Structure formats: structure tokens, C-alpha cells
């Protein structure tokens, strides 16, 4: 196809930038309007959880948008084009994550009425564990947000000439502005708009690509003939980058670390008015994730079919797989000015949603875990002012450190999942130990966190220094045999019918023994390694140092106690006594909206304590 063979670099035009600017302006307008409506925020709880009065549908769509950033918009289609439609198994991993979150983590966090996830670690273990979890979260979120902001700007610059700093500053300043002014409500409602933009962008690309390639049956037939319809890949080899098992086992644990215990997500579902609505939000989130991932994977298959005889990676038109998607958009919409701008808006909608989520969440844990424990008597208005200031500082910091993500190799999708897997995987193990193993103690969980982080970081660094070969990872073949344009750069020797990239492993005599075994494990297993190491080490050390007695634990901290737990922290107007809660049921009771200064939910002072009536002082 002519567009597939063109050697000159295409660029975005005025109409494209106009569409992009419109998306930024609408996002800003929504965020400011929601944030300033009804007099703004009167307390830190209003700023971070919207007063715990949010509806299920917008929260669910916000949950879906939070980790569906430009990294996924660019990375998922590229991976599907290179590895096939088996990428759809990720949806199964996400479904398992949603079920486990709804059954295990959500009830505990919601009924405790926490704003910061890491408050749980202090209630269950000690302040040292809480601070350790907070620090790990802040580091992981800073790195992840850096990838989300910088990588798409770099990729679009390399393909289209889009100015890196213009895109960084425009998106960074705008999301910092509406997050600082509007808080949680602004983040949620702009996320809803941005999910719609992402889906419309994918569907327009799908429709145009399928039409150009002769219809859906022709696309499926060509993809099948080139091994891209490969859902039945059940290879148990953990070194295969993508199989049913990597998505369902490794992928579900990575997503669980993002949704089950990650501050950004927990902060959203505890903002719902009732526990039942919070679970409904997770269901809406699952539907949103399925639509986004399925649309992105199908775009990848259409993209492969479009370039099947003239792979731009082999011909030198692009330098990395992540650049496939913007090139495809410019090629198939070259005669439709303004439509490529929709893709630009699609990509940066994901960036805005993730960055704003991260900024708000980092401000929340800083206030709840570092400021309020030391200054419990701060007035609500002062806390709001501090929260807004922290949002501005974190937004500025994310912009400043975004360039660090350029040090990560292997593609933006791998980079983002590696960061979350390495750092958040051990945290998932710590929370799971706390909720499921009554015997686990502070020395045990701290030892487990250290061991889990060390193991997952070891394999991630090893894989970066000694990357596995494409044959080991399972990259499918591509071709440049159909290229005829003289302006196309010459392919490397033997490039036809092969994929260009990392050379096959095993040829370098200097590679360590682990290079083709332990270091070659799929990056989706990094989180599982960290989680399992944390749990095993934490359990062992706990029993060796003297297990915690179950009777010494406060109510509401163990999952096993949920069956006999009959109440949750609730506003006075909704429930004032234990008898009321028995009638209404825990899933209908909203989480607490306010707590007295210096409140510490422990043993007999905790509203969940079964020896007292459930009553809050509002």
C-alpha cells in the first residue's frame, strides 16, 4: 500500500492540533466547573474522596481510565501486532482482579472508612510498616507517572515531529491545574470524558482500517494466515512474553496490585456512597477495561494486516514498536485532516487521566500518612489548602522527573508494568498477609517487603541488562518483502519474514547463567514474584519471631472476621446503632465522612468494636 511504503515523515496539521486543543480545553472546563461548584471543598475529605458521596458509574469509568493511559493506547496495539490476539486474555486477568478486589480488599477498606490505604498497615502492624508502604507507593507512582507523561511525548515526537516540551507542558500544567482546584470530583468527571474520547479514537481507527483492508472477514483471514489469531497459546514456559498463563496468573496479580491495594484506586471506590455502589463501580470498571483493551488489541491486528508486506520497523520508518500506532493513524487518515488529532486526543486523554489520578493520590497519602499524624489539630480549611499545595507540588515534580522514564528499555507498556510489578507487587503481599494471616507480625512483614522488593528488582534489572531474544519471547514474524518505494530505508540482512529487534540470546559468551532462565521470565510475572516472596518470607519470619495473637488484633482488620462483622463506619444520619446496621446490612451503609481530630481506629475505640453501639460523632 502506498501509505505503508512512504518514506517521508508525516506530521500533524492545524486541524489535528485544533481537535487536540479542544480536548484539553473541555477537560479543563469540566475539572474547574466540578471543583468550584457548590463552594468548592470544605475539608480534606471533600478534596480526596468527594465527601464519599460519588455515584457508581462515574467512579467505575474513572477506575478504568486511571491505568489506561497513553502507555496502553500506544503499547497494547503494538504488542498485539507483534504477538497476536492472545493479548485479549488480559481481560480475563482483569476480571479475576475485579472479583478478588470486590471480595477481599474492598469490604475491609470501605468498612474501616480509610482515606489512605496505608493507614491499614499501621492498624494491623505498626507505624514503621505504614511509612514503608507510603514510601514505596510514592516512588512507584512517581516513576509510573513519569513514563505516562514522557514516553508518549517522545514517541509522537519521533514519528510526527510533535514538540516534546509543548506536549509535556500543555498536558502537565492542565492536569495539575484542574486536580489542584477540583480534587477528586474533578478527577472523576474528567476521567469520564477522557474514557469516551479514548474509545471513540480507537473505534474510528478500527472502522477506517477495516474499510481500507477490505472488510472484517478479510482482516481476520489475513491475520489468521499470519498466526495472529492465536488465543489457544497455553505454553507454560514462563519465559514466553505472552501466553494464557502469563495474562491470567501474572497479569491478574499485577492488576490486583494496581486495583486491590493501590491508593489511587482504593481512594475512588471508598468515595462511593455505599459499599454496594462501590462494588457496582468495580463492575462498571471491568466493562470499561474490556472495551478499551479489546479495542486496542483489535487495532493492533488491523495495524499488522495494513503493514503485513511492508513492516515499517524493518524498513526503518520507525525505530521502536511503540511508534506503530501514530504512524498508522497518519497513514490511513492522511486525506482526512483533523481525524489524526482525534488519536492525539485519545492518547493524551489517557495521559491526563493517569497523571491527575496519581497527583491526587500522592497528595492524599502525604496528608493522611505524614502530616495529619504529626499535626492532628489542623483546621479543615488549612488541610484543604495544604492538600491543594501538595497537588501542585506533585504535579510539578512529575513533570520535572518525567525524562527519567527514557532510561527504561523494552517499550512503554513493559516499562509501566515493570514499575508497578516490582514495587507494588511486594505491597500486595504485605496487605494480603495482614488480611489473611493473623499470625503475621511487624518483623515478618518488613522482612517480606524487603525480600520481595529485592527479588523482583533483581530480575527486572537483570532483564534490562541481559534482555531475552525475540525467539524466547515469542515475537511473531513480519515481512518487508512487499516494499517497492525507493525512499524506504534498506532492511537489515535477512530482515524479510523476520522481526527486527533484540538479537537472539545465547550468542554472547559473557552472559551470566541466569540470563536465559531467571532474567528471561515474562515481565508480567515480576509482580507475582514480589508478592509470593513477600508472603512466604513474611509468614516464615513471623512464626520464627513469635506470631501475633489473634485476640490482640482490632476488629475489622482480618478478612476472616467479615462474615461475623455486622456493621461499618457510617454517618449518623444513616445508622446510629448496631441494631440499625443489622436491619440495613453492611453493604448499604456509607463509609465515614468525618472523624474526630486524632482519631485512631483501635480496639475498643473503633466503631466496629462489637461490644459497643455503632455511633459516629458528626
Curated annotation (Swiss-Prot):
Primary location recorded for the protein, binned into one broad class: membrane
Known catalytic reactions: iodide(out) + 2 Na(+)(out) = iodide(in) + 2 Na(+)(in); chlorate(out) + 2 Na(+)(out) = chlorate(in) + 2 Na(+)(in); thiocyanate(out) + 2 Na(+)(out) = thiocyanate(in) + 2 Na(+)(in); nitrate(out) + 2 Na(+)(out) = nitrate(in) + 2 Na(+)(in)
Sequence segments annotated as region (Disordered): 571-618
Membrane spanning stretches: 15-31, 57-80, 85-105, 131-157, 164-181, 190-208, 244-266, 279-301, 336-363, 387-408, 412-437, 442-465, 521-545
Biased composition regions of type Basic and acidic residues, renumbered to the chain: 571-587
Modification type Phosphoserine: residues: 551
Name the record gives this protein: Sodium/iodide cotransporter
Gene that specifies this protein: Slc5a5
Amino acid at each position: 500500500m502506498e501509505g505503508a511504503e512512504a518514506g517521508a515523515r508525516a506530521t500533524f496539521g492545524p486541524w489535528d492540533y485544533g481537535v487536540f486543543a479542544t480536548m484539553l480545553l473541555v477537560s479543563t472546563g469540566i475539572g474547574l466547573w466540578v471543583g468550584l461548584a457548590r463552594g468548592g471543598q470544605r475539608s480534606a475529605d471533600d478534596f480526596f474522596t468527594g465527601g464519599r458521596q460519588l455515584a457508581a458509574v462515574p467512579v467505575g469509568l474513572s477506575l478504568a481510565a486511571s491505568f489506561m493511559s497513553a502507555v496502553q493506547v500506544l503499547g497494547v496495539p503494538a504488542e498485539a501486532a507483534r504477538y497476536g490476539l492472545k493479548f485479549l486474555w488480559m481481560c480475563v486477568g482483569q476480571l479475576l482482579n475485579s472479583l478478588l478486589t470486590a471480595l477481599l480488599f474492598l469490604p475491609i477498606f470501605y468498612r474501616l472508612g480509610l482515606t489512605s490505604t496505608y493507614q491499614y498497615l499501621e492498624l494491623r502492624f505498626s507505624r514503621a510498616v505504614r511509612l514503608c508502604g507510603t514510601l514505596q507507593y510514592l516512588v512507584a507512582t512517581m516513576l509510573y507517572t513519569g513514563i505516562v507523561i514522557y514516553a508518549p511525548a517522545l514517541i509522537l515526537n519521533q514519528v510526527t515531529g510533535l514538540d516534546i516540551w509543548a506536549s509535556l507542558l500543555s498536558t502537565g500544567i492542565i492536569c495539575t491545574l484542574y486536580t489542584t482546584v477540583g480534587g477528586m470530583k474533578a478527577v472523576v468527571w474528567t476521567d469520564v470524558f477522557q474514557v469516551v474520547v479514548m474509545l471513540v479514537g480507537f473505534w474510528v481507527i478500527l472502522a477506517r482500517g477495516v474499510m481500507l483492508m477490505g472488510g472484517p472477514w478479510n482482516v481476520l483471514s489475513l491475520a489468521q494466515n499470519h498466526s495472529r489469531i492465536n488465543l489457544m497459546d497455553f505454553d507454560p514456559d514462563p519465559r514466553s512474553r505472552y501466553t494464557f498463563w502469563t495474562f491470567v496468573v501474572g497479569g491478574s496479580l499485577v492488576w490486583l496490585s494496581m486495583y486491590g491495594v493501590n491508593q489511587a484506586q482504593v481512594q475512588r471506590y471508598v468515595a462511593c456512597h455505599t459499599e454496594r455502589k462501590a462494588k457496582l463501580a468495580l463492575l462498571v470498571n471491568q466493562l470499561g477495561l474490556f472495551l478499551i483493551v479489546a479495542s486496542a488489541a483489535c487495532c493492533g491486528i488491523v495495524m499488522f494486516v495494513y503493514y503485513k508486506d511492508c513492516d515499517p520497523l524493518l524498513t526503518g520508518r520507525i525505530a521502536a514498536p511503540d511508534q506503530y500506532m501514530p504512524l498508522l493513524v497518519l497513514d490511513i487518515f492522511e486525506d482526512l485532516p483533523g481525524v489524526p488529532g482525534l488519536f492525539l486526543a485519545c492518547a493524551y486523554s489517557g495521559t491526563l487521566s493517569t497523571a491527575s489520578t496519581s497527583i491526587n493520590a500522592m497528595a492524599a497519602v502525604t496528608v493522611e500518612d505524614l502530616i495529619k499524624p504529626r499535626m492532628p489539630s489542623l483546621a479543615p480549611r488549612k488541610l484543604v489548602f495544604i492538600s491543594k499545595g501538595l497537588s501542585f507540588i506533585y504535579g510539578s515534580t512529575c513533570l520535572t522527573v518525567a525524562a527519567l522514564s527514557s532510561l527504561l528499555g523494552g517499550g512503554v507498556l513493559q516499562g509501566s508494568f515493570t514499575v508497578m510489578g516490582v514495587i507494588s507487587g511486594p505491597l500486595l503481599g504485605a496487605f494480603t498477609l495482614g488480611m489473611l494471616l493473623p499470625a503475621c507480625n511487624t518483623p515478618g512483614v518488613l522482612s517480606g517487603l524487603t525480600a520481595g522488593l529485592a527479588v523482583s528488582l533483581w530480575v527486572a534489572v537483570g532483564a534490562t541488562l541481559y534482555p531475552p531474544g525475540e525467539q524466547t519471547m515469542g515475537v511473531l514474524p513480519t515481512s518487508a518483502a512487499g516494499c517497492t518505494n525507493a525512499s524506504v530505508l534498506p532492511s537489515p540482512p535477512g530482515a524479510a519474514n523476520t522481526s527486527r529487534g533484540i538479537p537472539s540470546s545465547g550468542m554472547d559468551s559473557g552472559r551470566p547463567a541466569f540470563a536465559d532462565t531467571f532474567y528471561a521470565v515474562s515481565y508480567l510475572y515480576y509482580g507475582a514474584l514480589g508478592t509470593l516472596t513477600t508472603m512466604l518470607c513474611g509468614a516464615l519470619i513471623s512464626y520464627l519471631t513469635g506470631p501475633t495473637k489473634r485476640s490482640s488484633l482490632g476488629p475489622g482488620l482480618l478478612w476472616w472476621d467479615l462474615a461475623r462483622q455486622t456493621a461499618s463506619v457510617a454517618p449518623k444520619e444513616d445508622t446510629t446503632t448496631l441494631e440499625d446496621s443489622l436491619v440495613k446490612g453492611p453493604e448499604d451503609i456509607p463509609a465515614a465522612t468525618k472523624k474526630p481530630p486524632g482519631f485512631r481506629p483501635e480496639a475498643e475505640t473503633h466503631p466496629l468494636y462489637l461490644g459497643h453501639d455503632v455511633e459516629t460523632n458528626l
